Amino acid sequence: MVTDSAVTAPAGTESSVPAGLARSWLLVPGSADGLATRAGASGADVVVVDLEDGVAAADKGRARRALVAVADAGLRPWVRIGDAASDEWRTDVALLRGRDLVAGVVLAKVETPEHVRRTVDALDGALPIVALVESARGIEAALEIAEAPGVVRLAFGSGDFRRDTGAADDPLALLYARSRLVSTSRAAGLPGPVDGPTVRREPAVLMDASRHAASLGMTGRLCLREEQVDAVNAALSPTGDELAWAFDVLDTLERCGIRDGSDLPRIARARAICGAAEAFGIEADAAAVHISDYAS
């Protein structure tokens, strides 16, 4: 049982991966037992203390007190709060306003840029916002939401989107929604969006879903359990072989220069791979052998 007494967080366990690059976003209910330990030791790039759907109505107050206790223990997780049209939202922003409790806010059920603006204004612009898009209205307003001041990333609430639209839990059925979030994120100058979670527990299902998300241009995923984190991080990270390819491309560019316009996409991809690998602490595969695209 979560109590309001002081808790001690594990030392040295918070991720240094910035939110714009974060792959794994672990949702931990604010009412969960051992919240500070889970938040500090999960291995996720970002831990999100859930005050919204993951917490029963009767436990909301206890979850908010637990979030404060986590902050008192020295951790700064993100927090998912109620949607901007709800009474819970008012209570959540009142808790956060003017206090150094969290690193950022995942705003639930965003359907219009006004939902973001209300939240940013209520928090005096002090916290970055990940806008969780979970409905047909939200998907169709995705560009305006992405361009709202304060938004640093979009995320896909796939479960609620399926409930809203009647879509199946199938990659093809959700292809439009995911692709629209990718495209609008790019158009708004944001990083790739965060995909919704995999509910099923089979590791192969999780890995396939994560690779599918990556193939569309999504660069993060919500996780529901700690055991999902490693697979999500692996699926959304450059491999050692890919990093070796990127080094080869950039090295050859330095020696030979650009031959034609078709080189530019490869160079951009190589630089993106190197940047992500540096953030994630990934080293090139020394055994990888690549033949330069520019070699004479």
Predicted features along the sequence, with ranges:
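Expand to "…catalyze enediolate/carbanion chemistry for C-C bond making/breaking, isomerization
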Residues: 1-296
